[in-house]
Design a protein with these regions (language model features):
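Conserved SGNH/GDSL esterase-like catalytic core that processes O-acyl groups on lipids
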Residues: 187-262
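Transmembrane alpha-helices and immediately adjacent membrane-cytoplasm interface residues
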Residues: 92-116
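Membrane-interfacial, low-structure loops and terminal tails that flank and connect transmembrane helices
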Residues: 1-14, 79-89
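Short, amphipathic alpha-helical "lid/cap" segments that border enzyme active or binding sites
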Residues: 219, 223, 294, 298, ...
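Membrane/wall-proximal cationic-aromatic binding patches
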Residues: 112-207, 350-354
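Serine-dependent acyl-ester chemistry module
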Residues: 13, 18, 25-51, 55, ...
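Cytosolic-side transmembrane helix boundary signature
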Residues: 60-95
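Generic structural signal for small/hydrophobic residues in well-ordered secondary structure
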Residues: 183, 222, 238-239, 308, ...
Length: 400
């Protein structure tokens, strides 16, 4: 006896097949569209993952998407249709369970106290504390210790929160001073105070340096930090700001205090926790977001130079390039700096000159960076204080 199909089973079956086919074709289309050029446009250079890592991940994901798409569209489509036709209620239950799981995950994450992506570990040395204007700063007047590459590193801070040799040797704001702003590279992550760029720069120039850098800062946070601290110094000689193309993505984040058009201060933006987690794992950027980041970064770097000149200090942007400059990094550098006619010194560093088990520059690399800055500042002084023209200095080894 032939089994008579249940009334209405044909429509759910066709709907299931169509859904599987559409999803499969979509996955195949995405796999074809996700080229290296697309990747370079929407995934910015990363300090922690070289481009070749991104490309390898992209290849694996494209192959997986294409294979899954073909399987859904041409192999599993009839099975999906039959499954939906036999148990349409189960498909609805699965969809409801998925929605409830997402909602529950979001609720759990919202119950946790989360920090911006650049400050996830509260007990990490050097210790940070919340700051309503800047997002976070270092805890002042203390010394902390960390083991980096098998070395015990001391991070000491004076009462102003600047990194110093010893807590009882604070920066003197009345002396001629070179102010250094930036993030962990300028700060000297994994380096002793003597090995850090600001300390070596001060020694080469014979002028006191002030290390105002803070871990995880973006370019606009650097500017806000300078804006708050520059008035405290009576005789600023130079302001050296660090810009790394591999860290440009930070300038696009808004989960911290940030600057909008016209350098307008904006509070942190709250996002869905799951969306923030997905963005951390898959840092996709829309083209419009990148364009806004380029414009904001140019405006901030100009403002840093203007504030420095107003106080009689020479502004200089240092651009350390660890390893060979990839095409994506070159595009960011040219768009942010060259097209805006901003003065900077490009310092190419051997990719091997990094800390063990860490991607931060080692003491040898810090020496090269400090030497390049010193040469440019001497050149500016010889020009009677006039700003040096836009160009780059490629230096691959310590000066002899």
């Amino acid at each position: 006896m032939t089994e008579v199909p249940r009334s209405g089973s044909g429509l759910p079956r066709r709907a299931g097949e169509i859904a599987a086919a559409v999803l499969g074709v979509t996955l195949i289309g995405c796999a074809l569209a996700a080229t290296e050029r697309w990747c370079d446009r929407h995934f910015l250079p990363s300090f922690f993952l070289p481009r070749r890592g991104y490309v390898l991940i992209l290849i694996v994901v494209r192959v997986a998407m294409a294979a899954l798409g073909v399987w859904l569209a041409f192999v599993a489509r009839p099975r999906v249709g039959r499954l939906v036709a036999r148990t349409p209620a189960r498909a609805v239950h699965i969809a409801i369970a998925g929605v409830l799981a997402i909602g529950a995950s979001e609720a759990v994450l919202r119950s946790m106290r989360l920090r911006p992506a650049e400050w996830l570990m509260p007990d990490e040395e050097p210790r940070r504390q919340p700051d309503a204007q800047l997002g976070w700063t270092f805890v002042p007047a203390r010394a902390g210790h960390a083991d980096v590459g098998g070395r015990a590193i001391e991070y000491a801070f004076d009462s102003a929160g600047y990194r110093v040799r010893r807590v009882d040797e604070p920066v003197d704001p009345d002396r001629p001073t070179i102010l250094c702003i930036g993030e962990s590279v300028m700060f000297g992550e994994g380096l002793t105070w003597e090995e850090s760029v600001p300390a070596q720069l001060g020694g080469m120039m014979g002028i006191q340096s002030a290390n105002l850098a803070v871990h995880g800062y973006s370019t606009d946070q650097e500017y806000l930090r300078l804006q708050a601290e520059l008035p405290h110094f009576r005789r600023p000689v130079a302001v050296v700001s660090l810009f790394m193309t591999a860290l440009f993505g930070r300038n696009l984040d808004d989960d911290r205090p940030h600057l909008g058009p016209g350098l307008r201060w904006l509070p942190p933006q709250s996002h869905a926790r799951l969306a923030s987690l997905a963005k951390l794992l898959v840092p996709y950027r829309r083209s419009e977001t990148v364009e806004r980041g380029v414009a904001m970064t140019r405006e901030v770097l100009r403002a840093i130079a203007d504030r420095s000149r107003e106080r009689g200090a020479t502004p200089l942007i240092v651009v350390p390039q660890l390893g060979r400059e990839e095409a994506g990094e070159r595009i960011v550098r040219r768009r942010v700096l060259d097209e805006a006619q901003l003065p900077y010194v490009l310092v190419e560093i051997d990719d091997a000159w990094r800390l063990p088990w860490d991607r931060h520059p080692n003491a040898r690399a810090a020496h090269v960076i400090a030497a390049a800055i010193t040469a440019r500042l001497h050149s500016a002084a010889d020009a009677r204080g006039q700003t040096a023209p836009v160009s780059s200095m490629r230096q691959k080894g310590p000066p002899r």
